[in-house]
C-alpha cells in the first residue's frame, strides 16, 4: 500500500477532548473541545507558543494522562478506558517516544538502549541486539555501539533515541520537542532521520514544537492556542516542501520561505 492510501486511514481519533486541572478553588482549562483525526503514515506537527497546551495534548494522545472528558482512540481502541496495566502494555506494543532530553539509561550502551523495547517484548538478546545494531548503523552510529550516553554528544544521543523509538515499528511515534536541545545543523540531521524512518516504515509520527521550522517536516499541521485548535492544514508531499512554515491564524494559510526550492514546490495552503 502506498503512502497516499495509508494516509486515508485514521490511526488516531480525538473526540471533544477536554483537560482541566484544579488549582486551589479554581479550575484551569488546559485543553478544550479538541477534535481531530491523524492518519496512518502521516507526520503531524502540533504547533503553538509556550503555554498553548501542546505537551498536555501529547500526554493525552499517548495515554500518559487521562482526559477530563472526551476520548482518544488509537486503532479504534479508546485508550482512556484502559486500566493502568493495560495502558502500559498498550504503550509498549503500539507506541514509541522521542524525548527532548533523550531519556537514555546512563548505565546502558547505545546498543542496549536501542534494544530495550525489544527486551520488554521478550525478544532474545542476540536478535534484539542485532536489530539495534542495524538501526544504529542507519543513523550513522556504527562506531558508537558500545558507548555510553556520557560518551556521546547531544545529537548522537538523540539519534540513539530515534532508533529506540522506531525499533518495534510502533503504530505511532510521539516526539516532544525532539530538537529543542540541538543546534540548527544537528536539528536538520535529526529531523531528516525521523522523516526517513517514517517514510520507509510507513510510520505515523506526531511531533510537538513551538518552532515554525518544524512544520516544514509535516503532512498535517495542527495549531494550538489557549488549549484549543485555531488552525489546521494538510498536504501530501512533504519531500518537495521542505521550508519554513509560518502559521497565519487569521487567514488559515501556511507560508513557506526557502531559497533552495522553486515556488512550485512550496505549499501555501488553501
List PLM regions with ranges.
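Short amphipathic beta-strand/extended segments with alternating polar/hydrophobic composition
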Residues: 81, 234-235
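ABC family nucleotide-binding domain
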Residues: 10-224
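ABC-family P-loop ATPase nucleotide-binding domain
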Residues: 1-20, 235-270
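Intrinsically disordered, low-complexity regions
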Residues: 4, 25, 76, 155, ...
